[in-house]
Design a protein with these regions (language model features):
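Gly/Thr-rich phosphate-binding beta-strand-loop-beta motif of the actin/hexokinase/Hsp70
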Residues: 1-17, 122, 175
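Hydrophobic "anchor" residues on beta-strands that sit immediately upstream
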Residues: 3, 89, 171
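Metal-dependent catalytic core segments for phosphate chemistry
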Residues: 12-57
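Short acidic-glycine loop/turn motifs at beta-strand connectors
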Residues: 17-20, 83, 149, 168
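Phosphate-interacting basic helix/loop segments used at nucleotide- and nucleic-acid interfaces
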Residues: 60-84
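Short glycine-rich phosphate-binding loop at a beta-alpha junction
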Residues: 81, 88-95, 134
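RNase H catalytic domain
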Residues: 94-112
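Positively charged, low-complexity nucleic-acid-binding target-recognition regions
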Residues: 109, 113-238
């Protein structure tokens, strides 16, 4: 099975271990100036007036447009990730979205990217298309680990988008390297030894009436009742 690692971020919404990159459209940021202007006009209208109601509708329509644009983009990305026939396993980091939103410097950007909705859409689409979804530990050093030699570069800063491994000298793109490491971390979490699977009894079409009758007879015997065949025999003997 082909596995895929995904690293979520602010600049690029999703970077995949196969080289694909999905940009973050930043719907709220693009419309933020217009939204602030409409909200300012709304605050200046007299309460209860028809002009205030019209201004409120304009604000609501713009907010709805932003939400629909964001949701449409997330649907397209998650569909592209799960509808690929070659991808059977997706590995992702178990992000603490609520904790990220507590950071006042990142709260608006994280909310605009909508990581929570991305994970929700990806989960149910994976179940639809039969794709395994593996979540790696949120504290795993996916960005700081060299994908070639495994060295953990603890001095990597958040604003460094690329870095060179001090041990082997390999040049890494931060997001792509993280996606590859997330894939490896996820595959290592899979069980290496598989136990014996007990097959489920699934009778053929021709055998189903016989199996259903035998099951019904067993249920009645457990309850202490008389099966259909025994009742018929007793009537014939009479």
């Amino acid at each position: 099975d082909t596995a895929l690692g995904i690293d979520l971020g602010i600049k690029s919404l999703a970077v995949c271990s196969d080289g694909r990159t999905f940009d973050n459209p930043k719907n709220l940021q693009k419309s933020l100036g217009r939204l602030k202007l409409l909200q300012k006009r709304l605050s200046r209208k007299q309460k209860g007036s028809s002009n205030r109601n019209k201004a409120r509708i304009r604000v609501a329509r713009l907010q709805e447009y932003i939400a629909n644009s964001r949701k449409d983009n997330l649907h397209k990305i998650t569909h592209a990730l799960t509808h690929d026939s070659q991808v059977r396993t997706i590995c992702m980091e178990d992000l603490n979205v609520k904790g990220m939103q507590r950071n006042h410097h990142l709260a608006q950007a994280v909310g605009d990217a909508s990581f929570g909705m991305f994970l929700t859409l990806l989960e149910y689409k994976c179940s639809w298309y039969g794709v395994n979804l593996i979540k790696t530990g949120r504290f795993a050093p996916s960005s700081k680990t060299c994908g070639k030699c495994g060295h953990v570069y603890k001095g990597l800063k958040l604003n460094e988008r690329s870095w060179i491994c001090p041990k082997c000298g390999t040049h890494h793109d931060r997001d792509f390297n993280a996606a590859c490491n997330i894939k490896e971390f996820g595959l290592k979490a899979l069980p290496t030894e598989r136990g014996k699977v007990k097959p489920v009894d699934c009778p053929l079409v021709d055998d189903r009436p016989r199996v259903l009758k035998s099951n019904g007879r067993k249920k009645q015997e457990k309850k202490g009742g008389i099966g259909f065949s025994e009742a018929a025999k007793s009537l014939v003997l009479r």
